[in-house]
Amino acid sequence: MSRKKRKRGRGRVLILVVLLALIVFGVFARGIFTSGKTTTEHAQRELHTYAEQHETSLADYPDALVQLYARNPDARDFVRDYPKKKDLTPTIDLSNLSGSKTVPLLLQWDERWGYREYNESIIGLAGCGPTCLSMATIYLTGDTTKDPLWMCRFAEQNQFNVPGSGSKWALISEGGRMLGLDVTQIPLDKDRIYRNLDVGNPIIVVVGPGDFTTDGHFLVLTGHSGDKITLNDPNSPTNSAKSWDCDTLAGQIQALWVLRRAG
């Protein structure tokens, strides 16, 4: 074999190796980037197909819901059902949660209340704060009438809401006390967090941009095992099923309140 042919052969092998590497890297990178999410354009295509099959239209979906569909796979059924169910007012009965030994996970986009108005939006998009306070109140008092819809109306009546946005932090501190809870804001201190979780005190936190939100979001810390914390994310059963490293959360937490039953 001539030297030129050997060089051409090695060149072809090198090209194949590079192409294979690019293909593998491309697939791997896409998997990391999407992490279950999808693009807005892809979400629009999926919703358009679904709408055609169910006698609705893509135009029936507000842009904010299309974005929710794209970024949160857990909420996709809620988004798909919006045109058909947005005007329904189903009965809300959480009596099965009375006496719960753990903080119940409630989702802001539960179809029983998620389509109802809140803050010039809907609870499913803007109701994380009231939903967190609802979880803690039901757990601490056993009063299952304080569901997320009730809590949103409570927030509006007492001006704890921010029209066009979310909820004021005062919803947790002042609002919690108005509901008969003992609410204490605490510093970001691991030992204090762990001590409260060890005795069953839920901790409502506000987090900034990071694993849970691009803006601001409320969560309920519910327990821990060593430095791993369990939490209820009102926007994600997936996040709620994980254990989170305390240091990971600490870099995102902006405020914390310990809640107890007063008296």
Regions found by a protein language model. Give the residues of each.
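Active-site-adjacent structural segments surrounding the nucleophilic cysteine of cysteine proteases
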Residues: R3, G11-V18, V24-F160
